[in-house]
Amino acid sequence: MMRSTLSLLQKCRLPNNNGSLLSFKNNQVVNQTALFSMKSNQQYRFYSTDVKDLAPLIKELRNRTSAPLKDCKEALIQNKNDIEKATSWLHEKGKSTANKFADRAVVEGTISIVVNNGKAVILEMNSETDFVSRGETFRALADQISRATLESNLLAQSLAEIKPDTIAPQPASGSTVADLIVGTVAKLRENIRLRRVHAIDASNQPNTIVAGYAHDPSGTNQFGRLGSLVQLQYEGGQPDIAALNQLARNIAVHIVGVGPSYVSIESVPKVLLDEAIANKRHPNSLYDEVVLLEQKYISGEDNETVKAAVQRISKQLKTNITIKSFVRYSVGEGMEKKVENYGAEVMEKINKAK
């Protein structure tokens, strides 16, 4: 029976699942991608006839694009194992997916901070949900962009804002920042936006200290919903650099915790002071709220201000310390967040049903 069936099949050309034809040679079914042997014991065995192993290509494509394994495999199959065409195919697929989520509100997210050898970057990256923003994939993207920025030529000698769309391509993968975001959107199925970036390069500036802090319950100090960078300068003497670094870090923590807006009284806009006076508010009350140097220092002694603490530590270290600048980020600040009132929604439905 087996022989007669095989004889009949050998006279036929059968279509396979992808529409190409199967032919027979030496009792075997043959096509471009697979064959199976028909044994007398009626066992069927499938073999790959594709000489090129996909595993190394999939690995390379994953490194380039961070796309899921199944997407990398599909891209290679669709493009006949051409790695460049497969990369372009995945980028186009990612853009198509990202466009579907582009109009969704992004008010959650994370603050990422990287400080290394006198250089520092702080950025805010937003997502739709807090769940995604706390995930490893989202934070890895924020870290990757932070470090790409740190190694770029966009950093100034003073703390300054950088436009997100000017950040250089990520050298390790050859992808732009936009490509990295698109790939992650396709993977997480949520809209993602790089909202803002500040950075400084003080690596060649003498007597300058930079520090950063992100408030994270897990204790990483790199990611959180609040973060800050601060720049200090010192003049004279040979102070303990470790002590200066600790002071800068403590001030960065204070900035995150208390939330000042300006370094000194002199930097407060006149319009803000006029508004306080018009509202019969004492200027000192305003300064306590918005001026860093006038605030009670959270790491200080005997209820001292930040200014008093800096003066005290300057004397201890026999140098003159100045807070030059700082920046503070809070996730979603200034953005309108939709608040769901499910109770009101239920009552509205009940009233409509009456």
Curated annotation (Swiss-Prot):
Residues 1-47 form a transit peptide. The keyword Metal-binding does not apply. Keywords: Elongation factor, Mitochondrion, Protein biosynthesis, Transit peptide. One of its GO terms (biological process) is mitochondrial translational elongation. It is found in: Mitochondrion. GO terms for cellular component: mitochondrion. Gene3D superfamilies: DNA helicase RuvA subunit, C-terminal domain, Elongation factor Ts, dimerisation domain. One of its GO terms (molecular function) is translation elongation factor activity. InterPro entries: EF-Ts_dimer_sf, Transl_elong_EFTs/EF1B, Transl_elong_EFTs/EF1B_dimer, Transl_elong_Ts_CS, UBA-like_sf. Belongs to the EF-Ts family. This is Elongation factor Ts, mitochondrial. It comes from Heterostelium pallidum (strain ATCC 26659 / Pp 5 / PN500) (Cellular slime mold). The lineage of its organism: Eukaryota, Amoebozoa, Evosea, Eumycetozoa, Dictyostelia.
